[in-house]
Curated annotation (Swiss-Prot):
Gene from which the chain derives: ANXA8L1
One example GO MF annotation: phosphatidylserine binding
Lineage: Eukaryota, Metazoa, Chordata, Craniata, Vertebrata
UniProt-recorded name of the protein: Annexin A8-like protein 1
This protein's record includes keyword Nucleus: no
Keywords tagged on the record: Annexin, Calcium, Calcium/phospholipid-binding, Metal-binding, Repeat
């Protein structure tokens, strides 16, 4: 399943709108959970992980109207650590959350290139447009200009190209001659020569539709006798290699890509909690069920079982509630 289809697959949703929804009692439940000494974390989990993002925004409005307080700020003051980070992430409207993740990836010393690559390579053009709009509204600057200021070289070029690209202008028609020409151009830009023409790779990967790219990858393998992924690994390195491989992976199978991100967020010593939280929150109302199925096929274990092994406490319980039952 390619990435451009994932946005319309409602069977992939793990967090759905609650039926018979009324924001007022939910807001009251949250207020009581945080009133006085101590906090009822389970009550917070039961409400916020079982409501859609739209419903959470309504709960926040009701909370403000009934109690005169900002719900997100109240949650921040009552919770802490990874659990706080997860619950607060649930309170952001989707585009604003992704804008925040991009902003956080660039602020301060160092840049988290992996976060930027993940978001820009896996979202459609319309989604990126909304993220750019939210970014400018919330931070008063252009996402494109901030990326240009914070990165350099070919990485900067591929990230800006992804922001401006037309990969999701999907057509059932693919020009076989153009696909073959693109495959030949990629071969000539890498395997055929000493050195690499990085801009040729960037231009084709970032400006062609997904259906077209799938045909290009097939033709490339016939010409080069190796996959496009293997060629990228041998011709590039570092963050540019990661960006190109991410575009290829998302074109071939978006759900497998996110399954891989979640797996490596928990594999080995330590947990990459930012990656774990971001991908579960952002995909829970899109295709997390489909990601769970690919996760089990790829790694022989369920996503929820790995979460149980790798996390603990209220943080674990909230993640499991968002992920839902095993496939």
């Amino acid at each position: 399943m390619a990435w451009w289809k994932a946005w319309i697959e409602q069977e992939g949703v793990t967090v759905k709108s609650s039926s018979h929804f009324n924001p007022d009692p939910d807001a009251e439940t949250l207020y009581k959970a945080m009133k006085g000494i101590g906090t009822n974390e389970q009550a917070i989990i039961d409400v916020l992980t079982k409501r859609s993002n739209t419903q959470r925004q309504q709960i926040a409005k009701s909370f403000k109207a009934q109690f005169g307080k900002d719900l997100t700020e109240t949650l921040k003051s009552e919770l802490s650590g990874k659990f706080e980070r997860l619950i607060v992430a649930l309170m952001y409207p989707p585009y604003r959350y992704e804008a925040k993740e991009l902003h956080d990836a660039m602020k301060g010393l160092g840049t988290k290139e992996g976060v930027i690559i993940e978001i820009l390579a896996s979202r459609t053009k319309n989604q990126l447009r909304e993220i750019m709009k939210a970014y400018e509204e919330d931070y008063g600057s252009s996402l494109e200009e901030d990326i240009q200021a914070d990165t350099s070289g070919y990485l900067e070029r591929i990230l800006v190209c992804l922001l401006q690209g037309s990969r999701d202008d999907v057509s059932s028609f693919v020009d076989p001659a153009l696909a073959l020409q693109d495959a030949q151009d990629l071969y000539a830009a890498g395997e055929k020569i000493r050195g690499t023409d990085e801009m040729k790779f960037i231009t084709i990967l970032c400006t062609r539709s997904a259906t077209h790219l799938l045909r290009v990858f097939e033709e490339y393998e016939k010409i080069a006798n190796k996959s496009i992924e293997d060629s990228i690994k041998s011709e590039t390195h570092g963050s540019l290699e990661e960006a190109m491989l991410t575009v290829v992976k998302c074109t071939q199978n978006l759900h497998s890509y996110f399954a891989e991100r979640l797996y490596y967020a928990m594999k080995g010593a330590g947990t990459r909690d930012g990656t774990l939280i971001r991908n579960i929150v952002s995909r829970s109302e899109i295709d997390l069920n489909l990601i769970k199925c690919h996760f089990k096929k790829m790694y022989g274990k369920t996503l929820s079982s790995m979460i149980m092994e790798d996390t603990s406490g209220d943080y674990k319980n909230a993640l499991l509630s968002l992920v839902g039952s095993d496939p």
